[in-house]
Amino acid sequence: MADNLVIVESPAKAKTIEKYLGKKYKVIASMGHVRDLPRSQMGVDVEDNYEPKYITIRGKGPVVKDLKKYAKKAKNVFLASDPDREGEAIAWHLSKILELDDSKENRVVFNEITKDAVKESFKHPRGIEMDLVDAQQARRILDRLVGYNISPVLWKKVKKGLSAGRVQSVALRLVIDRENEIRNFKPEEYWSIEGEFRYKKSKFTAKFLHYKNKPFKLKTKKDVEKVTAELDGDKFEITNVNKKEKTRNPANPFTTSTLQQEAARKLNFKARKTMMLAQQLYEGIDLKRQGTVGLITYMRTDSTRISQTAKDEAKQYIEDKYGKDYLSNRTAKGKQGDQDAHEAIRPTSTLRTPYEMKAYLTRDQHRLYKLIWERFVASQMAPAILDTVALDVTQNNIKFRANGQTIKFKGFMTLYVEAKDDKDNEKENKLPNLSKGDEVTATQIEPAQHFTQPPPRYTEARLVKTLEELKIGRPSTYAPTIDTIQKRNYVKLESKRFVPTELGEIVYEQVKDYFPEIIDVEFTVNMETLLDKIAEGDIGWRKVIDNFYGSFKLDVERAEEEMEKVEIKDEPAGEDCEVCGSPMVIKMGRYGKFMACSNFPDCRNTKAIVKTIGVTCPKCKDGDVVERKSKKNRLFYGCSNYPECDFISWDKPVGRDCPKCNHYLMEHKKGRSSQVICSNCDYKEEVQK
């Protein structure tokens, strides 16, 4: 038996670290938390100063037994769980279970799992930081007090199996508030005028800007006619040319939030998937002859700080690959209020390029690693330099403006450009080289009617960004929060955007009326600030909980007495049960709506609700094409006569045949655009709107 025992959370991490430390160290995994509050009871004694009652997590008995066996034989036990509050709490629970000496410095932390970083950390063990543990305990106890008190009220008054949590309730509120904005939105008419102009052989477009040298809003068609009536002929003059040089700086390296956002936009990954892949890259990848190496730094962080060593290595790579002109001369500033003094998410070595790592990674691991690597290296590169030009095109004091932009020096854009949540569809408007006084010819003046649009629903990326901007939750809570409100069927995804369900809105209304603090953004933000103060040792955790629980307990008592029972009525399905002939009804289940026989429990017939798209099956010519969902929740199209007809397609049939070969046409989506195609020949056309 080795003299030194090291305990980490996962087998993958254990395997990587044991190779670095050598034969004198035995590294084993605790498989995450080993102690927690019991599931069968609240586990917090509110009469005894909120003392938590921790028990060994069900199923962890054999793990704890092994940990005790190895700890008894070892001379030294090191606790090397993750470098955050959750990791500190795991170390503390392990210390208690194994009855380790509190005065010993046996806590080891590292931000990256590389040989040098791990070996260096073992030279500087420290004691467990109880302020960090207390911050985690406070969060856990607060969440338990909220969930364990509100959930039974919801079971009694609304429906069994419901829950309401501190952070999840605010996330649900954001989705519902946005939906209400959309419902209450009243579109307003407005117009635009776009002109197409020619200068010699070049053409460019410009948009209406001023009427009689003043800004003029085009609210109606009459406003447009007022402007166009003043135009005389097709000759216009260039009255101003404004050229500027603009620099565009690279984005900072990733934090947890920005990684989740960018992976959603660029890779179409859900937050949970992003974090799972990042964990794998952090804990270690087998690089064959090089051994197992952690490829990225710790992935739960809100810091944009980068170590000097990492900066120097990146700069050397950039100079060798692109030349000195591409080196950044900026001094990047880390975010104020970075928690726990972590670094940003970055590759542990710039020299391990995505191309070289591809052979050792799965497709999705490689895509995420490439994103992290490129974002980090780009953050250390020179800004891009853009030449912008604005042309004023005028006739009779009616002014149009054309804006153009060309890249003078690509800088970091050579490697990486940040994605945007909502890309505008404007094409690049390259402008001819014009001077003040030049004459141009209008080839077309085109008015267009528009209506203002409601605010868009939240994508997962936008919801994560909003939670971070509002300072709700921590890097480790974004993915689980979004996952929870989906699993509870409080929200659903439609076209990759969140829509509240009927159940979600009912739960929200009840929580809003009786537990206003729980869904209050400012209250939740203030609580996060208090948790940070606990971590910094500025306030005691019991005081924070006591200040909250006094008023919350009164809210619970009022809800139990006054909250009216909500009856979620079954909606008629409009068809009869094929088993017993009773009417079918639409019920709300854990995974959404489904059809069930109203004669339950005597008849237990159920079936899924299918949505037809108004197109006859192109294969059997009898059934209807219906929307279905795969096991991975991906939309596909099938025939209502299944299994008699096995028609299936990822692309949506449009109900027309190809004019070239008479095969059926389908709408094929690629990214944000769609095209009607024939799968049998090369025929293509634009989607009819």
Curated annotation (Swiss-Prot):
Residue span, Topo IA-type catalytic domain: 129-557
GO molecular function: DNA binding; DNA topoisomerase type I (single strand cut, ATP-independent) activity; zinc ion binding
Amino acids binding Mg(2+): E9, D82
Metal-binding in keyword set: yes
Cofactor(s) this protein cannot do without: Mg(2+)
All residue ranges annotated as the Toprim domain in the record: 3-113
Residue positions of the active site: Y298 (o-(5'-phospho-dna)-tyrosine intermediate)
UniProt GO BP: DNA topological change
One GO cellular component, as annotated: chromosome
Swiss-Prot/TrEMBL catalytic activity: ATP-independent breakage of single-stranded DNA, followed by passage and rejoining
Keyword Kinase: no
Span list, region Interaction with DNA: 163-168
Keyword entries, A-Z: DNA-binding, Isomerase, Magnesium, Metal-binding, Repeat, Topoisomerase, Zinc, Zinc-finger
EC number annotated for this UniProt entry: 5.6.2.1
SUPFAM superfamilies: Prokaryotic type I DNA topoisomerase (SSF56712)
InterPro entries tied to this protein: Topo_IA, Topo_IA_2, Topo_IA_AS, Topo_IA_cen, Topo_IA_cen_sub1, Topo_IA_cen_sub2, Topo_IA_cen_sub3, Topo_IA_core_domain
Zinc finger (C4-type): 577-603, 617-645, 658-681
Site (Interaction with DNA): H33, R139, R140, D143, Y148, W155, R300, R488
Role description: Releases the supercoiling and torsional tension of DNA, which is introduced during the DNA replication and transcription, by transiently cleaving and rejoining one strand of the DNA duplex. Introduces a single-strand break via transesterification at a target site in duplex DNA. The scissile phosphodiester is attacked by the catalytic tyrosine of the enzyme, resulting in the formation of a DNA-(5'-phosphotyrosyl)-enzyme intermediate and the expulsion of a 3'-OH DNA strand. The free DNA strand then undergoes passage around the unbroken strand, thus removing DNA supercoils.
Subunit text: Monomer.
Family from the record: Belongs to the type IA topoisomerase family.
Protein's recorded name: DNA topoisomerase 1
Organism name: Staphylococcus haemolyticus (strain JCSC1435)
